[in-house]
Amino acid sequence: MITHPQVRFEQRGPELVAVEIGQRSCSPLIGSVHRALFALGLDISSYRARPEGGGLVEHLVLERSGGGRIEGALSAEAKAAILPIALQVCVTEG
């Protein structure tokens, strides 16, 4: 059972390639995450959602809008944009 948000960033070396967000709620976060990433020039190239442990797990594969790698400062900015969205679910439900 998912009792608190779980966020797992997938990297290939220094490059951020995907994020997986698990939450208690069954309300998808893709809309909020997409808006935050779009502001950074990032897109979601693939999305999967599955029910798990009474909640929802979303897997998002990321890419730069103009091509190239998501690494360094851009990787840190993407993570910083995603984490508050995932953690906000816990605050509003808790």
Place the predicted regions along the sequence by residue:
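Regulatory modules associated with amino-acid/nitrogen control
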Residues: M1-G94
